[in-house]
């Protein structure tokens, strides 16, 4: 109780340089782009639900969202160091966030974060296979 827990934390998205360049080139001309769903969980039923049945999943990515990220990323990277030791769970197969960069930043921002790396886990840790969930629940408890 009272712990700070970060699951696949977003410091910056994967391929951030490309995304920023695309945003600068396209945002004056388009309001959104079609969304591409990625394989961000090893649970095929969850992935099917996201793609086909979840009414909260947008089919387009607003360029304003990428614009918000252009403000978020520098803000997080400039944030002052905190006297916290969060628990961090990160999948090494996560292709949504730039997790290597994120862990480097988190190590700079926090006092000795406790990090669990799961080699085969992807971004949607809460919707990963039961075995992966068990491993990080054991780490968190």
What would you call each of these model-derived segments?
Residues 1-64:
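Alpha/beta-hydrolase-fold enzymes
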Residues 68, 101-104, 135, 139:
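Alpha-helical elements of Rossmann-like donor-binding domains used by nucleotide-donor carbohydrate transfer enzymes
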């Amino acid at each position: 109780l009272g712990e700070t827990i970060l699951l696949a934390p977003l410091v910056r998205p994967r391929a951030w340089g490309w995304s920023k360049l695309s945003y600068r080139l396209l945002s004056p001309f388009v309001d959104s782009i079609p969304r591409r769903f990625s394989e961000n969980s090893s649970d095929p039923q969850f992935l099917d639900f996201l793609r086909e049945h979840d009414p909260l999943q947008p089919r387009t990515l607003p360029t304003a969202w990428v614009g918000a990220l252009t403000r978020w990323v520098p803000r997080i990277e400039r944030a002052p160091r905190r006297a916290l030791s969060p628990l961090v769970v990160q999948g090494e197969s996560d292709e949504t966030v730039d997790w290597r960069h994120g862990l480097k930043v988190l190590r700079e921002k926090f006092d000795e974060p406790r990090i669990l790396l799961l080699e085969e886990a992807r971004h949607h840790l809460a919707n990963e296979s039961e075995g992966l969930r068990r491993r990080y629940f054991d780490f968190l408890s």
